[in-house]
Amino acid sequence: MRKKQGRLTIVKQTEVARDSYELVLEGELVKHMSQPGQFLHVRVDESEDLLLRRPISIANIDPEKEQVTMIYRAGGAGTKRLAAQRVGTEVDVLGPLGQGFPLEEAKRGEEVLLVGGGIGVPPLYYLGRRLVENGARVTSVLGFASQADVFYEQPFKQLGNVHIATADGSYGAPGFVTDVISQQSLDFDVLYSCGPTPMLKALTARYRERRAFISLEERMGCGVGACFACVCHVENGQAHEYRKICTDGPVFPVGEVVL
Ligand SMILES: Cc1cc2nc3c(=O)[nH]c(=O)nc-3n(C[C@H](O)[C@H](O)[C@H](O)COP(=O)(O)OP(=O)(O)OC[C@H]3O[C@@H](n4cnc5c(N)ncnc54)[C@H](O)[C@@H]3O)c2cc1C
Ligand code: FES
């Protein structure tokens, strides 16, 4: 597939939780974006010291306005630089990249469980919107470190039932998303998840035999299949069998790759 790259203009940049920003970009490149779970590779600014792009998931798309929303945590040098960019600034974006969540796996009327942790929550919002449009019934379980980190509870509530968990117990249920799933006896036809590796490992251990899909947000370099920084091994595969998270993923069927 031909690489897509363009300059998008910042039309909104708001802090939605502690050190977490909702960034809305506008421009022609957005017309190529439609698959939930794909990501954009963002050049945070034009300075020489931050040449490496940062991968950030698509959290929402408004095709009519040609706007894409991302939600990111400003944790390191690059994302902090991005958070300092103001409305009206142009940002260099490569994408959409990767293989997103398979929407067709959830049929009309089926129960879908969205399980997100921290910066893994954003791509599940656009996924949930598309699933609801397709007639699936969506329940979301969203985990955060603390109350100050919680974002997008209301938008998710518009899609269906929402359960929030915080690790320190300051909001919602105390503990992890997996605790909530057990306590509430939540079941599903299809599960989609994105979040930290320990969470994805726990879900894989439980739901290996189920219709479940996980998105990996851990390792990335070039974003386009050229550098091998994102390689992961296939479960029970030969030593030479691998997948590239950037081009084969970031979404994989549960149990396909070694976490
Ligand atoms: C497919 C994908 C989707 C993602 N979606 C989101 C999202 O929607 N919201 C969000 O907040 N974060 C997301 N991330 C994580 C985000 O890319 C990292 O938090 C970010 O790159 C860290 O950059 P930094 O400038 O804060 O840190 P720095 O420490 O300055 O980063 C240094 C280098 O390491 C890389 N790096 C560091 N941590 C990560 C990481 N966890 N994943 C990938 N590369 C990393 C950076 O890209 C950069 O090249 C996603 C990651 C991937 C792979
Ligand atoms: S990030 Fe370079 S090959 Fe995947």
Curated annotation (Swiss-Prot):
GO terms for molecular function: 2 iron, 2 sulfur cluster binding; electron transfer activity; flavin adenine dinucleotide binding; metal ion binding; oxidoreductase activity. Disulfide bonds: none annotated. Its cofactor is [2Fe-2S] cluster; FAD. The keyword Ribosomal protein does not apply. Binds 1 [2Fe-2S] cluster per subunit. Binds 1 FAD per subunit. Keywords: 2Fe-2S, Electron transport, FAD, Flavoprotein, Iron, Iron-sulfur, Metal-binding, Pyrimidine biosynthesis, Transport. FAD binds at residues 54-57, 71-73, 78-79. Residues 3-103 form the FAD-binding FR-type domain. PROSITE patterns: FAD_FR (PS51384). GO terms for biological process: 'de novo' UMP biosynthetic process. Pathway: Pyrimidine metabolism; UMP biosynthesis via de novo pathway; orotate from (S)-dihydroorotate (NAD(+) route): step 1/1. [2Fe-2S] cluster binds at residues 222, 227, 230, 246. It comes from the Bacteria. Belongs to the PyrK family. Heterotetramer of 2 PyrK and 2 PyrD type B subunits. Responsible for channeling the electrons from the oxidation of dihydroorotate from the FMN redox center in the PyrD type B subunit to the ultimate electron acceptor NAD(+). This is Dihydroorotate dehydrogenase B (NAD(+)), electron transfer subunit.
